[in-house]
Amino acid sequence: MYKRQGKFWYLSLAHGNPFGKLVKYSTESNEVVDETTLGLFPASMQVSTTTGFLYCVNFNLHGSMKPSTVSVVDPVTMTEITSITTGSMPHGSRISPDGLFQYSVAMMSGELFEIDALGLEVNRTLDLENKMMKNDGMKSMDGMKSMNEMKSMDGMKSMDGMKHSMVKPTWVIPHPKENLAYIAGNGSDEVIEVDLDAWKVSDRFKTGKGPYNLEISPDGKLLIGTIKSEGKTAIWNLDDKKLLGEIKNTTSVSHGIAISSDSKYAFISVEGIGGEPGIVDVINLETYELVSSVEVGKQAGGIAFWKKDI
């Protein structure tokens, strides 16, 4: 991730002893300028153009599932100002276009969190579970013949005292022009649209298996999603939710998305498996075709677009 002024870029290092850290680099030399310790498994992050603070979710893959936090950092002094408790395995830290709110989803507790970027506290929480899915799950439980199976499930619930989401949301992206947000339901194979004014789910539409990251073109017309389990990238028209294209990525495990400022190209990081290199695929958003690829380091993950120079 980079700051809008372009002097520095930032990297979250998830693994630590036990905590991860945030590292600040110079864009001129790509050398480390500073670093600071965050929480357990820091992951996605973004800087608010209004507050100037950096908001990083602490995904926390360690031990039993429990509520984790969002770290708020002053990127100038590289000081963690505070940490805000949200849900279990928070991911997909994204800021509203006006810079006033930070959004993240809790993968294992199935919730959307809105944080007041100025007040530095949780403003609203939304349960993303589909009631129909819940009912189907209960019917499945009622149909179990073995009491041992029921006891086993009760034991799983009591281990950490938290619900286990069927949606398993992994990403949220606010619309650049409308008061809507879109969420990747990695477990339910869907995109969830949330009306931020009414604070409720306004639409759901199915995807391929395991949608992971989402991004919206700067002109607000297209939604791009990585379909991680299938190694594909999907493109939807946001006016009618129609699938415009589904592109097979160059290798397996599609991950991050960055879109050019002119809304013409999407850059997709693809992790690869085993000894394969990571790859960045370039997709033309006018023809919905893969136009180029470049090999990068193994297990390519986060990706950002800085600016377009002509």
PLM region spans:
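Predominantly soluble domains enriched in secretory-pathway, periplasmic, or organellar proteins
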Residues: 3-310
